[in-house]
Amino acid sequence: QPRSRGLGDVYKRQGYMNKEVDLSVSCYGKVKDRKYDIAILPWGATEPHNLHLPYMTDCILSHGVAVDAALMAKQKYGVNCMVMPPIGMGSQNPGQRELPFCIHTRYETQKAILTDIVSSLYVQGIRKLIIINGHGGNTFKSMIRDLSVDYPDFLIASSEWYTVLKVKDYFENPGDHADEVETSVMMHYHPEL
């Protein structure tokens, strides 16, 4: 197989250049006449991932998982999902914040971003949102509870992609950051990175 010439080639080769499920590569012409059942929001952080992974690792991986989930939902259940562009604003722990270009986002800022997204989707008739979280510092439970008061008929669910399976069943030395798990998943989605 020839070597990839860029991210677009990787997306095409792996089937991720799907304008019907991925808003990052879609256009109004592809989505305007389709009805979407669920919006999927990848959420990560901007932070160093050791010396070998990109700063946006959490976003890249949660986006890849979200696209896979959207494609599976369509194929297996006939559910139309749209994957939103990933949010790169995460909550950071002290000790991490001092590292160059590590961006910390306060709870209030994250809540404001989520509120604006929910409010936009609500006006457009979408009533279901799944957050695919890729960063351990992010917590959405309180935000979701607060939003349910203002939007009682809007369902929001959140899942950390890295907790769905027991990593110890698949990896010899799992850790929790820039480890064997994140490195392997990055190699799956974007070997060129």
Please name every model-derived segment:
Residues 1-14:
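Single conserved hydrophobic/aromatic residue that forms the stacking wall/gate
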Residues 13-54:
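Active-site and ligand/interface coordination hotspots across diverse enzymes
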Residues 19, 89-181:
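Active-site histidine-anchored catalytic micro-motif
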Residues 33-43, 79-91:
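Short coil-to-beta-strand
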Residues 52, 56, 77-79, 97:
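Extended amphipathic ligand-handling, pore-lining, and cofactor/metal-binding catalytic surfaces
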Residues 58-71:
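Short catalytic helix/loop segments, enriched in acidic residues and glycine
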Residues 72-79, 148-154:
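Short helix-capping segments at alpha-helix termini
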Residues 176-184, 188-193:
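Domain-level recognition of soluble alpha/beta enzyme cores
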